[in-house]
Structures are given as structure tokens and as C-alpha cells.
Design a protein with these regions (language model features):
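A short, polar/charged loop-to-alpha-helix boundary motif
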Residues: 25-31
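Short, hydrophobic/aromatic alpha-helical segments in well-folded domains
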Residues: 4, 35, 58-61
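Short histidine-centered catalytic/ligand-binding loop motif
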Residues: 40-47, 140
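Conserved beta-strand in the GNAT
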Residues: 7, 13-23, 35, 40
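Mid-sequence acidic-hydrophobic segments that form the walls
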Residues: 21, 42, 58-65
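Conserved acetyl-CoA binding element of GNAT-fold acetyltransferases
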Residues: 31-43, 56, 75-76
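Terminal substrate-recognition subdomain of acyl/acetyltransferases
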Residues: 1-10, 14-15, 26, 63-193
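Conserved acetyl-CoA-binding loop-helix of GNAT-fold acetyltransferases
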Residues: 46-61
């Protein structure tokens, strides 16, 4: 397992970090490399796309260093705004509204969900499970719900119990096309449906 940690500073003080874990899973065909990310920022330094951009940068470096490896992003997202951040930048991020998940994605997700306890299947390609709940105030929870969008509505439909610690299991194949699509959409401020 590799564990890059990216720290963000402002005037010599740490204001946030993104911990990116890369786990190697052996399968009958070939090894899979599963990337996950956990980020946190001080309140005044949020909403600047640092989490996604730093993850894309690390992943591009890994992809260039190991071009033949199957690399996937799999994470249980515990907030609707975080789901929106990822789903709005790539059409290859699943699950998503009105788009069935490809079979190879479901197979990888099946491997990962077997590593968690109390996984609930809420539709054909939607899985949730209990996660460690980030510290949030009631005001923050209300604000998370007030930002309506197609992606947030999808998240809320399938994970209305996120505020008690349920996380939506999400997946994205990290091939070069997906990474470039996400990077361009972030840099141009463009969102996908």
C-alpha cells in the first residue's frame, strides 16, 4: 500500500491535507490498484477544488509511472457536496442518475464491498455502508441539503441517512481519458450531468 499525503499551507500554517491511499488487490486475471482519498480543510480554505486537483495530480503521476496498471478510484462518500464534486467532473463516475453502471465497475465494486461490514444494496448499482462520521454542526448539515442539483438530489435519494454516518460507495476507472476529462472540467469550471 502506498500512502501519499498532500498538505496545504498558508503563511507557514497547515490549512488542510489530502491522504491518498493506493491499495493493491490481487484477482484471478491481474492485480487492481484501488485509490481512495480522505481530505480535510479548515473552514476558510474549503471550496477551492484542492481535494480533486491534488488527487488528479497524484493519479496522473502514478498513471504515467505505471501505464499498464488498472487503477480505480473507490471511496465511500459521506456528504452530498463531496459526491457532487466528483460526479459533476466526470461522466465515468458511478453511481449516477439514470445511467447504469458498467459491468466491469460493478465487479470491482463487488470486490471492495466484501471488505466492508453492513453493506446495504439500495438499487442495482447503489451500495452504502456505515462510515466514520466527520464532525459537522447541525447548521453545516442543513447547508449541505440546501444546495440542490441533479447530483445532490441523486445522493439524497439513495443516502438520506448520511448524517448518521452512511456512506455512498462510489467508483471511477482512472484511465487517461477520465483523468483528462476531470482535469479539464475542473480547470474550466465546467460540470457534467
Amino acid at each position: 500500500m502506498a500512502l501519499p499525503i498532500i498538505r496545504f499551507y498558508h503563511r507557514g500554517k497547515i490549512v488542510g491535507q489530502n491522504i491518498i491511499a493506493i491499495l493493491k488487490l490481487k484477482t484471478a486475471h491481474q492485480p487492481l490498484y484501488i485509490l481512495s482519498s480522505r481530505a480535510a480543510f479548515l473552514p476558510d480554505y474549503r471550496n477551492q477544488n484542492r481535494t480533486l486537483l491534488s488527487a488528479i495530480r497524484v493519479t496522473l503521476g502514478y498513471r504515467l509511472k505505471y501505464p499498464t496498471r488498472q487503477l480505480w478510484f473507490v471511496s465511500s462518500l459521506m456528504q452530498p457536496k463531496v459526491y457532487r464534486l466528483f460526479a459533476s467532473r466526470s461522466k465515468r463516475f458511478y453511481p449516477r442518475a439514470e445511467v447504469p453502471m458498467p459491468e466491469d465497475y460493478l465487479q470491482v465494486l463487488d470486490l471492495i464491498q466484501n471488505r466492508h461490514v453492513n453493506v446495504q444494496q439500495r438499487s442495482d448499482d447503489v451500495f452504502v455502508h456505515p462510515c466514520v462520521l466527520p464532525q459537522t454542526t447541525p447548521e453545516q448539515l442543513i447547508r449541505l441539503r440546501n444546495r440542490a442539483s441533479r447530483h445532490i438530489n441523486f445522493y439524497m435519494q439513495h443516502t438520506p441517512d448520511y448524517f448518521i454516518g452512511m456512506g455512498l460507495m462510489c467508483i471511477c476507472k482512472l484511465d487517461l481519458l477520465t483523468l483528462l476529462e476531470a482535469a479539464m472540467n475542473v480547470l474550466l469550471g465546467r460540470e457534467v450531468a
